[in-house]
Amino acid sequence: KKHVKVDLKELTVAPYYGCQLNRPWGDIDDLQHPVMMDRLIETLGAGVATNYSAKTICCGASHMMPYEKSCLPQVRRIVNDALAKEARAISTVCPLCQFNVDAAQSGLDLPDMPVLYFTQLLGLAFGLGEKDLQLKKLLVPFKIAI
């Protein structure tokens, strides 16, 4: 907490655990209702999207390429739930989750929902800039207007 330099209180984040963060099952956090990332986001000073029910559903993982039509409803639910909770961004630690949820939005006709790596959120709180955090590499843009 002592390293936080930027006030993120205006930023509400939907913590997206996906299906892999809790593996090995239950050893790190509660399998059905994890809170580890929620608490870390709160420690950074950002708001947490409460009752974000999609936070543990699978994004489609490696099935997104061969079975895209089956996976898109899952991404739709992940994004719609974050939008319903008034989140301005989704945060995840999984590279495949980040890519799937970020890239799949272009075909879903939904309002844009940026998907940040948790480390990018850390960087924002610690005062790193857009260039340092490679925010322009995200497919759904995220602006640092905090």
Q: Which sequence ranges carry the predicted segments?
A:
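Iron-sulfur cluster-binding electron-transfer modules in prokaryotic oxidoreductases
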Residues: 1-146
